[in-house]
Amino acid sequence: MAIKLIVGLGNPGQEYMFTRHNAGFWFVHHLAQQFNIALAPDKKFHGVTGRGQIHGSDVRLLMPLTFMNKSGQSVVPMVKFYGIDNDELLIAHDELDIPAGSIKLKTDGGHGGHNGLRDITPHIGNDFHRLRVGIGHPGHKSKVSGHVLSKAAPDEQIAIDSALSAAFEALPLLLDGDIEKARSQINGFKLPE
């Protein structure tokens, strides 16, 4: 099935905008800019939403404004209201277990400790598509909170942006429902040396 809803997970507020935890927001924000999709607050879905054409496909965008650990309060109502099947849903989020500059497309699986996914999966299951944007791990779990809530170093940010660009290039495949080709293209991305 083709992707009909693209969600970017993050935390609302200017103080969080450029933190690693907002990598999902960066993805959706860039899509909205690139394809001239107006984003506006939507109280019904506790988020910022938009709808428009991306590579000829009608797509909805969502950035929850509920803070990361309450993402389900935004995503679940929108999925249910519009009758979005899980295989039509793509959730972009930061991923500690992948180095900055890497990006992976995954379907199914657990929440992997990600609080945004942890709040969504009990309500809709786990068989949706995830765009896992690598932000790297700080080395010890006691440093995770500070890591995700801080800005990436300039070289890391360049690497993350390059990985996001690789996902943008695979978007036509995702929107056409060719998930396996998209997965191969995205997961095969390597930073230039």
Swiss-Prot record:
Site (Stabilizes the basic form of H active site to accept a proton): D94
Top-level taxon: Bacteria
PROSITE patterns cross-referenced by the UniProt entry: PEPT_TRNA_HYDROL_2
The keyword Hydrolase is assigned to this record: yes
GO biological process: protein quality control for misfolded or incompletely synthesized proteins; rescue of stalled ribosome
EC number: 3.1.1.29
List of catalytic residues: H21
Key words, A-Z: Cytoplasm, Hydrolase, RNA-binding, tRNA-binding
Molecular function as annotated in GO: peptidyl-tRNA hydrolase activity; tRNA binding
SUPFAM superfamilies noted in UniProt: Peptidyl-tRNA hydrolase-like
Role this protein plays: Hydrolyzes ribosome-free peptidyl-tRNAs (with 1 or more amino acids incorporated), which drop off the ribosome during protein synthesis, or as a result of ribosome stalling. Catalyzes the release of premature peptidyl moieties from peptidyl-tRNA molecules trapped in stalled 50S ribosomal subunits, and thus maintains levels of free tRNAs and 50S ribosomes.
Subunit structure: Monomer.
Name of the molecule in the record: Peptidyl-tRNA hydrolase
